[in-house]
UniProtKB/Swiss-Prot annotation:
InterPro entries: Kinase-pyrophosphorylase (IPR005177), PSRP (IPR026530). Bifunctional serine/threonine kinase and phosphorylase involved in the regulation of the phosphoenolpyruvate synthase (PEPS) by catalyzing its phosphorylation/dephosphorylation. It comes from Desulfotalea psychrophila (strain LSv54 / DSM 12343). PANTHER family: PYRUVATE, PHOSPHATE DIKINASE REGULATORY PROTEIN 1, CHLOROPLASTIC. ADP binds at G151, V152, S153, R154, S155, G156, K157, T158. One of its GO terms (molecular function) is phosphotransferase activity, phosphate group as acceptor. It catalyses: [pyruvate, water dikinase] + ADP = [pyruvate, water dikinase]-phosphate + AMP + H(+); [pyruvate, water dikinase]-phosphate + phosphate + H(+) = [pyruvate, water dikinase] + diphosphate. It comes from the Bacteria. This is Putative phosphoenolpyruvate synthase regulatory protein.
Amino acid sequence: MKNIRHIYYVSENTGLLAKDSGKSLLCQFPGVEFQEELLPFIRTKDDAQRTINAIREKCGEEKPIIFSTIFDPEINKILQHEDVILLNICEPFLTQLEGMLGKNALRASGHSRNVDQQIMSNRVDAIHYTISHDDGTAIMDYEEADLIIVGVSRSGKTPISVFLATQMGIKTANYPLVEQDLTFCQLPEDIIKNKHKVVGLSISPDVLHTFREQRYKGSHYAQMSTCKRETLQSKRIFEKYDLPVVFSDARSIEETATQVAQELSKQWNPIF
């Protein structure tokens, strides 16, 4: 019989921080099998008591591991039961901050929810903007963008833009280089005047050909010669305007989006 360790992620909110942090630690133990469960929205002492009772009943004599991001000391006191191992992810850092700042932390529930609500509001705005400015739509509104991704058609601009909006709250417009741009090696004026927000997205002709063939098989648009010409011209445009460039080949959407965000940071932050 396999030795499986039960893992619980508990939080007063969604529990995503507890889960992400816990998983980052657990992945350092590849030889151990874990059974994980997310228990969000534990906001009262009654919630905590019901939670700990259910965990103890399910795990029996085994000591399960609980990753927590709960601040409330009364709730933590209930969760700190002798039959479980409680790892509060925030507490060590909170204690350090108290020492450095010379002040006691509130350790009160609800404050992080206010932050979460603001983050959610920002992300909703970013998503709305990004969807409304996909594929060169409403280019005259690029002043409001946090980021403008430029690249040839089917290079991955839309999924990367959506990821940046939903996960990072970045208002992202994306613009496809059309035939006129490629022929004259010229960007539209609305992009040029927002050049400090622009990141070029590059892709190899082979990968671009594969993507286009999947959707428009046998078309001139998908031909290798077309893909080679467009990727070469896009490279010339990026060089002409001295734009930062991210290569999307052999990377996941998450990896490419993160690198795009890093390039944006370099544009804004002189330290980088």
